[in-house]
C-alpha cells in the first residue's frame, strides 16, 4: 500500500476526545500518544459541547456504561455532528445486556457515526445477524463476516470495521481484508478499544471521501505494530507485548506499513 495518513497524523497531532471505559482509558491514551495523536479522556456531560468544538475526532466506547455516560455520549455525538468532526462507535459487548442494546440503538438513532468498529459478534448484533457471543468477546457464528460488514456500512452510512484474525473494512461497496496481526492481541485487555481510538486518530486527518482508505491504513498500522512487537515473544508474554505494542506504535514508519501490509480488496 501507499501510506498517506501516518505522516499527516504525526505532523498535525490531532486532539482525540475519548468517552471510553475504565478498563481501556489509560491504554488508549498511551497508545494515541505513541502513534502521534493527543488524547483527552472525559465523560463529564458539563463539558461535552466544548470538547467537541476543541477536538478533531471523537470515540464513543460503551465498555463500562453508566446512565450518566449515555447522556454525555449523546450530547457529545450530536455536537460532533454539528461541528463536523468524525465520530467512531465501539459497541463493546452490545449483545450482552439489555442496557447495552438500548444504549447502542439510541446512539445509532441520534448520532451519525463515521465508523463503527467492533468484533464479529458485536457487528453481527448491530446488523441483525444471528451470532453466539460470550460477554464482550466475539464468540462464534456461521454468517459471512464480509457480508456483516457490508450490512452495517450500508444501514448506517458509515465505514464498518470488524477486527479479528482477519480484519474486514467496508464502506458498503468496497471491502478490504487485512491479514496482519498476532494471536497476542486478544490476550490483552483493551486492544480493540485502542484500535478504535487509533481509527479515530486516522479519521481526524482525513477528508470524508478518504475515510475508507484512512481506516485501511490505520488498522494496518496497528496490526503491523502488534506483529512486530510479538516477533521475539512467547505466547505467554502478555505484559511484554503490551509494552512492545506501545513502543512499535511510536516507532512505526510509513515504509514499514508499505512493506508489511497484507491487504486484499473485493
From Swiss-Prot:
It catalyses: 5-(2-hydroxyethyl)-4-methylthiazole + ATP = 4-methyl-5-(2-phosphooxyethyl)-thiazole + ADP + H(+). Its cofactor is Mg(2+). Pathway: Cofactor biosynthesis; thiamine diphosphate biosynthesis; 4-methyl-5-(2-phosphoethyl)-thiazole from 5-(2-hydroxyethyl)-4-methylthiazole: step 1/1. Keywords: ATP-binding, Kinase, Magnesium, Metal-binding, Nucleotide-binding, Thiamine biosynthesis, Transferase. GO terms for molecular function: ATP binding; hydroxyethylthiazole kinase activity; magnesium ion binding. It comes from the Bacteria. The keyword Translocase does not apply. It is an enzyme of class 2 (transferase). NCBIfam families: PRK09355.1, thiM. HAMAP family: Thz_kinase. This is Hydroxyethylthiazole kinase. The lineage of its organism: Bacteria, Pseudomonadati, Pseudomonadota, Gammaproteobacteria, Pasteurellales.
Amino acid at each position: 500500500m501507499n501510506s498517506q495518513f501516518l505522516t499527516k497524523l504525526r505532523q498535525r497531532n490531532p486532539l482525540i476526545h475519548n468517552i471510553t471505559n475504565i478498563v481501556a482509558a489509560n491504554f488508549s491514551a498511551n497508545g494515541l500518544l505513541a502513534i502521534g495523536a493527543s488524547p483527552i479522556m472525559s465523560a463529564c456531560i458539563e463539558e461535552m459541547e466544548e470538547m467537541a468544538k476543541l477536538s478533531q475526532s471523537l470515540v464513543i466506547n460503551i465498555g463500562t456504561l453508566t446512565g450518566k455516560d449515555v447522556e454525555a455520549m449523546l450530547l457529545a455525538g450530536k455536537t460532533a455532528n454539528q461541528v463536523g468532526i468524525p465520530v467512531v462507535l465501539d459497541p463493546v459487548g452490545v449483545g450482552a445486556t439489555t442496557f447495552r442494546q438500548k444504549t447502542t440503538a439510541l446512539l445509532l438513532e441520534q448520532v451519525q457515526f463515521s465508523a463503527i468498529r467492533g468484533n464479529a459478534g458485536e457487528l453481527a448484533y448491530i446488523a441483525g445477524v444471528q451470532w453466539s457471543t460470550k460477554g464482550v468477546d466475539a464468540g462464534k457464528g456461521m454468517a459471512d463476516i464480509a457480508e456483516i460488514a457490508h450490512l452495517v456500512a450500508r444501514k448506517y452510512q458509515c465505514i464498518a470495521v470488524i477486527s479479528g484474525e482477519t480484519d474486514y473494512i467496508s464502506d458498503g461497496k468496497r471491502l478490504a481484508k487485512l491479514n496482519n496481526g498476532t494471536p497476542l492481541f486478544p490476550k490483552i485487555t483493551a486492544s480493540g478499544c485502542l484500535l478504535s481510538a487509533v481509527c479515530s486518530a486516522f479519521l481526524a486527518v482525513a477528508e470524508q471521501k478518504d475515510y475508507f482508505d484512512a481506516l485501511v491504513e490505520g488498522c494496518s498500522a496497528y496490526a503491523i505494530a502488534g506483529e512486530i512487537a510479538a516477533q521475539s515473544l512467547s505466547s505467554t508474554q502478555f505484559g511484554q507485548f503490551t509494552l512492545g505494542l506501545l513502543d512499535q506504535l511510536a516507532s512505526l514508519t510509513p515504509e514499514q506499513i508499505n512493506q508489511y501490509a497484507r491487504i486484499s480488496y473485493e
